[in-house]
Regions:
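P-loop/Walker A phosphate-binding loop and immediately adjacent motor/lid segment at beta-alpha junctions
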Residues: 75, 80-81, 85, 123-144, ...
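Gly/Ser-rich helix-loop-strand patches that form or flank binding pockets
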Residues: 19, 26-28, 101-148, 231-274
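Short histidine/acidic/glycine/proline-rich micro-motifs that form metal-
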Residues: 12-13, 61-62, 92-93, 118-120, ...
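Small/aliphatic-rich secondary-structure junction motif
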Residues: 1-56, 135-138, 150-218, 237
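Structural beta-alpha unit
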Residues: 33, 40, 77-112, 207-240, ...
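A short acidic, glycine-rich active-site loop
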Residues: 55-70
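Short, ordered loop/turn segments at secondary-structure junctions
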Residues: 38-41, 93, 117-118, 145-147, ...
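Amphipathic coiled-coil/heptad-repeat helices and related helical stalk/stem segments
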Residues: 18-19, 98, 125, 165-168, ...
Length: 274
C-alpha cells in the first residue's frame, strides 16, 4: 500500500477520460488528490490605444474566469462521488506566473500528473514543468491519452547511471511495485552485454519489485528517443520511467535533447524526474 499526495495540473478544458484516469491513479496509489485548474490570460494592453482594446480584453478575462469557475464546480461535483480524498483549486494568471503557482502547490506533493490538455499548450506546459521540476523538484507523470494501467502493467525503465535516472527510479517505486513486469533498457553501443545494471536490479528487488529483466540496446547512430520508442513498443510497455534533463536545461532548449524530444512526442504514459 502507498500513500501519495498527487497534484494534477490541468486546463479548464480537461476531458472526462483524463479526470477518470487521474482518479484511477489516486485509487491505485491510495493517494490524496489535489486538482489545480490553471487558466492563462493575455498580457494587459498598454500603450496609446488602451482605451480601444481594454473592453474586449476585460470581456475575454470574464469569459475565461467563468469557464474556470464552471470547471471547478464540475470537478468538485464529480470527485465528491469517487470516495477519494481530494481538493480543487484554481488560478487565472499570465503565463510567466504559472511556474510560481505550480511551485506553491507542488512543494508538498509526491507526484505531479499532466494530461493531454496541457500537452497541447506548449507555453503553459513549459511553465508547469518549470514549476514542478526546477522549483518544487517533484516528478511528473505524463498521461497523454488517459491510458494509465495499474493492474499488472508492463513498465520500461530507460536507465543511465545518472542522478536524474536514479531519482526517477526511486520516486517511481510505488508504481513499479504494481507492475507485472519491469524491463530495464540501457542504450549504449559499448556497454558490456553480460551483466547490465546489477546495482539497479538489486535495488529494485530489495524494494519488492518483481519480474525484472535488463538488456543493453545499441544506438547504431539512431536518436536515443527512437531507440527507446522502438524498445517500448517491442516489450509492450504501458509506462516508461526515465530521468529528465541530464544536460543543462539551456543546452536542451537551444540544441534539443532527449527530454525535450520525449515530452514533445509522447505517445504513452511516461514518468520523469530530475
Amino acid at each position: 500500500m502507498t500513500d501519495l499526495a498527487i497534484l494534477h495540473v490541468c486546463s479548464p478544458n480537461i476531458g472526462e477520460a483524463q479526470i477518470l484516469s487521474v482518479v484511477n491513479a489516486a485509487k491505485a496509489l491510495c493517494g490524496y488528490l489535489s486538482v489545480f485548474v490553471i487558466g492563462t490570460s493575455a498580457v494587459p494592453p498598454i500603450g496609446a490605444h488602451v482605451s480601444n482594446v481594454s473592453v474586449p480584453w476585460m470581456k475575454e478575462r470574464q469569459r475565461d474566469q467563468a469557464q474556470i469557475d464552471k470547471t471547478v464546480r464540475e470537478l468538485e461535483g464529480f470527485l465528491a462521488g469517487t470516495g477519494i480524498p481530494y481538493n480543487v483549486e484554481s488560478a487565472y494568471t499570465e503565463v510567466f506566473s504559472v511556474d510560481n503557482e505550480v511551485d506553491r502547490r507542488a512543494r508538498l506533493a509526491d507526484l505531479v500528473m499532466i494530461g493531454a490538455d496541457l500537452l497541447g499548450d506548449q507555453n503553459t506546459l513549459e511553465a508547469v514543468l518549470d514549476g514542478a521540476w526546477f522549483h518544487a523538484d517533484v516528478p511528473v507523470l505524463f498521461d497523454p491519452a488517459a491510458s494509465l494501467v495499474f493492474d499488472n502493467p508492463t513498465v520500461m525503465i530507460a536507465w543511465q547511471e545518472t542522478a536524474e535516472a536514479s531519482s526517477a527510479v526511486r520516486a517511481s517505486v510505488p508504481l513499479l511495485k504494481l507492475a507485472g513486469s519491469v524491463h530495464i533498457v540501457i542504450v549504449d553501443d559499448n556497454r558490456d552485454l553480460r551483466d547490465p545494471a546489477p546495482g539497479l536490479l538489486s535495488y529494485l528487488s530489495s524494494r519488492g519489485v518483481e519480474n525484472l529483466s535488463a538488456e543493453v540496446v545499441p544506438r547504431n547512430d539512431r536518436l536515443v528517443t527512437h531507440v527507446l520508442d522502438d524498445h517500448a513498443e517491442r516489450v509492450g510497455a504501458n509506462l516508461v520511467v526515465m530521468g529528465a534533463y541530464g544536460h543543462a536545461r539551456l543546452r536542451e532548449w537551444v540544441f534539443g535533447g532527449v527530454t525535450r524530444s520525449v515530452v514533445q512526442h509522447l505517445t504513452r504514459p511516461t514518468f520523469m524526474a530530475r
